[in-house]
Curated annotation (Swiss-Prot):
The gene is murA. One of its GO terms (biological process) is regulation of cell shape. SUPFAM superfamilies: EPT/RTPC-like. One of its GO terms (molecular function) is UDP-N-acetylglucosamine 1-carboxyvinyltransferase activity. It catalyses: phosphoenolpyruvate + UDP-N-acetyl-alpha-D-glucosamine = UDP-N-acetyl-3-O-(1-carboxyvinyl)-alpha-D-glucosamine + phosphate. The active site is at C117 (proton donor). UDP-N-acetyl-alpha-D-glucosamine binds at R93, D307, I329. This is UDP-N-acetylglucosamine 1-carboxyvinyltransferase. It is found in: Cytoplasm.
Length: 419
């Protein structure tokens, strides 16, 4: 099994090209099921989860072809299966996003209950309740969600009990082909939701309010394929910016989206970074200074993203001062803390809050990735730790970061993939 071997690397410097957003690409690929003609998606990152999504679409009978580094073409002409099997779904929670498109276009879907990162319960009840309000008959048995509808789904007024990105996306796709108007209240506002909505609009959907907490969808009878470019990955961008801050370096992220990262950039400035932005780039310069400790509380967008929490644990571990990081989105999302403690970090957990006392140096150690973003934090820690750090179970990392070792090498990082 692959591992990453990391040596202390000094200040990162240079330009890094940001990949397409995993969390936008996955729902957009699933939306291909809604299109009656060929659907061409570009800026698709080469990741394990993307490969799983393509395999799932092929399993349903769709023709999926990849060309170049970042292009995917989907044709549903021969789609004739309506079951997303456990073997595929168990490795990726986002497989649940096939439910809405299959049900909306074909009237039936059997989807295995999902797997993915081990960071909390993340129930699917909001997806199911919304689809039931749109007229679907749903039962959960033998580990599968079995959904049926006679004719088209019906537009509905849906109030979501809690903000859920996945449920908002599933209902958005289902409502695009429903009969009548659907209103989703307390909808997720994440940029990836907006990207999906923009893609659906390019396919012929009628959607208003994406990016606000109330989204209105006027259902149409059919959607057509289009050419669509996935947005840049704001979490990959943030991860490289934190790595530069921790190593006291200066880097520029190219093909980035500064507007989607405002909460993260504000915290990096609080930590002492000088931030400059253009339309599609972000430059961070620490001017050789040690970061200052910053308090973090994860909240739904436009607040501070839970997917950047682990990286800021590393920043605070090496910062000047003491900070608290409070996780409000997922339970069980501090599994990186014991691993960072093995490297010498001074951290203590109290419920959903981590108290971090900054120290000057970490020490290299053998550590284990427990989920996608935790694994990124361990790589960042390895870049500034004395000695060698080995990160095991990096299949988590490959789910969400494209060519991460090559990108760090391009910035001067000593990161190697080994067996």
């Amino acid at each position: 099994m692959d591992k990453l071997k990391i040596e202390a690397s000094g200040a990162l410097a240079g330009d890094v090209v940001i990949s397409g957003a995993k969390n936008a690409a996955l729902p957009i690929l699933m939306a291909g099921v809604l299109a009656e003609t060929d659907f061409n998606v570009s800026n698709v990152p080469s990741l394990r989860d993307v490969n799983t999504s393509c395999e799932l679409l092929r399993c349903l009978g769709a023709e999926v072809t990849r060309s170049g580094d970042d292009k995917v073409c989907i044709s549903t002409t021969n789609l004739n299966e309506f079951c997303a099997p456990y073997e595929l779904v168990k490795t990726m929670r986002a497989s649940i996003l096939i439910l809405g498109p299959l049900l909306a276009r074909y009237g039936k879907a059997d989807v295995s209950l999902p797997g993915g990162c081990a960071i909390g319960a993340r129930p699917v009840n909001l997806h199911l309740q919304g689809l039931e309000q749109m007229g679907a008959k749903i039962e959960v048995k033998e580990g599968y969600i079995k959904a049926r509808v006679d004719g088209r789904l019906k537009g509905a007024h849906i109030f979501m009990d809690m903000i859920s990105v996945g449920a908002t996306e599933n209902l958005l796709m289902a409502a695009a082909l429903a009969d009548g108007e659907t209103v989703i209240e307390n909808a997720a506002r994440e940029p990836e939701v907006v990207d999906l909505a923009n893609c659906l609009i390019a396919m012929g959907a009628k959607i208003e309010g994406a990016g606000t907490d109330t989204v209105r969808i006027q259902g149409v009878e059919s959607l057509q394929g289009c050419d669509y470019q996935v947005m840049p990955d704001r979490i990959e961008t943030g991860s490289f910016l934190v790595a530069a801050a921790v190593t006291r370096g200066k880097i520029r992220c190219i093909k980035a989206d500064p507007k989607s990262l405002e909460a993260v950039l504000a915290k990096l400035e609080d930590a002492g970074a000088s931030i400059t932005t253009g339309d599609d780039w972000i430059e961070l310069d620490m001017q050789g200074q040690r970061p200052k400790a910053v308090n973090i509380k994860t909240v739904a967008y436009p607040g501070f993203p839970t997917d950047m929490q682990a990286q800021f644990c590393v920043l605070n571990a090496l910062a000047e001062g003491t900070a608290t990081i409070t996780e409000t989105i997922f339970e069980n999302r501090f599994m990186h803390v014991p691993e960072l403690s093995r490297m010498g970090a001074t951290m203590e957990l109290e419920g959903n809050t981590c108290i971090i006392h900054g120290i000057e140096k970490l020490n290299g150690a053998q550590v284990m990735a427990t989920d996608l973003r935790a694994s990124a934090s361990l790589v960042i820690a390895g870049l500034v730790a004395d000695g060698t750090t080995t990160v095991d179970r990096i299949y988590h990392l490959d789910r969400g970061y494209e060519h991460i070792e090559d990108k760090f090498k391009g910035l001067g990082g000593d990161v190697k993939r080994v067996k």
